[in-house]
Amino acid sequence: MKYLNCFISTGLAAFFLVNSTSVLAADCSSDLTSGISTKRIYYVAPNGNSSNNGSSFNAPMSFSAAMAAVNPGELILLKPGTYTIPYTQGKGNTITFNKSGKDGAPIYVAAANCGRAVFDFSFPDSQWVQASYGFYVTGDYWYFKGVEVTRAGYQGAYVIGSHNTFENTAFHHNRNTGLEINNGGSYNTVINSDAYRNYDPKKNGSMADGFGPKQKQGPGNRFVGCRAWENSDDGFDLFDSPQKVVIENSWAFRNGINYWNDSAFAGNGNGFKLGGNQAVGNHRITRSVAFGNVSKGFDQNNNAGGVTVINNTSYKNGINYGFGSNVQSGQKHYFRNNVSLSASVTVSNADAKSNSWDTGPAASASDFVSLDTSLATVSRDNDGTLPETSLFRLSANSKLINAGTKESNISYSGSAPDLGAFERN
């Protein structure tokens, strides 16, 4: 027996005690290191049977049987494939995660061999049921990896629990927001995950975002290495949330376009909607990219609090940065080292410098190796990280190199940070 590292990402790691022939690691993990071990593995397959004991993929359990049996510190190991949840017109078909793991002993739900386990809730395109979430996560300390949720009747995942992690997951073609955190959900982390083509027929596309940590969500929610594209409303929506959300190294693009031929389409089309409804939310976004969004790339949206915006790139949105609304007395935005190209900027009530539209050098197409935005949907690397392409990378002679201001928690090479989301090494 030995430990095989299965979850390596952005400093977060979990380790499973499995047989020396790994069903988890395959070719996309590294560093065989001791750490947290599972007490038990429940092997699950799309054709699993509740009468099986789940001791191997030769005798796989059903997912529902594994959910009933699993305890903190244990692993539900999913054979890659499609897990179909039957649809009945007018009825919900939610999977509820109401158990809780513990600090240091979460409940793991992971696809084997770095594969994908797709939970298909089977809702037809125009059908929806109020609160028919795909995954309803009410418990705490769950860790999901390699899982996709599609065609749910409402949100793909609705999270009100805390200390949950979603790594290398995807939420697409659902009837509302891909993954929403609300009603007290706190200290949840979403890593290297995608949300795309989510649309709500209920309100003609005006609700379905990619990721939505919003309204009554609690403190400590964080998004790292995530992509949100071609959702009917916004990519990331932090509407009406006074609790700080942190977004790092994430991309939002082509949101708010009517891909559904809805004659009454009402999607907003912001990349990163960073607040709203006059709530005071001191959110932070760094090293992120927005392009091709119908409305704004980075949007204040009536947030009455100051937002921190450092080392981001915005290109060809309706407006690249829209921060023209009033803020509460004593509040101020903080802008450093950001790039705007091929669209306008409105920033007021801000401490702003070393951006391409103020004291920093103006950006032009020649500053970049590539502006081919089709590269944004290149497949992720095997470990789930965003693909390293030439898109928005600085050219060797770019005037944006070393043109930024040093900031805490912003790494750089050279004499000073570069402008924009990507540091040239």
Swiss-Prot record:
Main subcellular location: secreted
InterPro entries recorded: PbH1, Pectin_lyas_fold, Pectin_lyase_fold/virulence, Pel9A-like_beta_helix, Polysaccharide_Lyase_9
Gene3D superfamilies recorded: Single-stranded right-handed beta-helix, Pectin lyase-like
Class in the EC hierarchy, top level: lyase
The keyword Phosphoprotein is annotated on this UniProt entry: no
Signal peptide: 1-25
Pathway where it operates: Glycan metabolism; pectin degradation; 2-dehydro-3-deoxy-D-gluconate from pectin: step 2/5
Active site, per annotation: 273
Membrane-spanning residues: none
GO MF term (any one): metal ion binding
Disruption of the gene: reported phenotype: The pelL mutant displays a reduced virulence on potato tubers and Saintpaulia ionantha plants.
Residues given in the record as Ca(2+) 2 binding sites: 402, 413, 416, 418, 423
Cofactor(s) required for function per UniProt: Ca(2+)
Name assigned to this protein: Pectate lyase L
Originating organism: Dickeya dadantii (strain 3937) (Erwinia chrysanthemi (strain 3937))
Organism lineage string: Bacteria, Pseudomonadati, Pseudomonadota, Gammaproteobacteria, Enterobacterales
Gene behind the chain: pelL
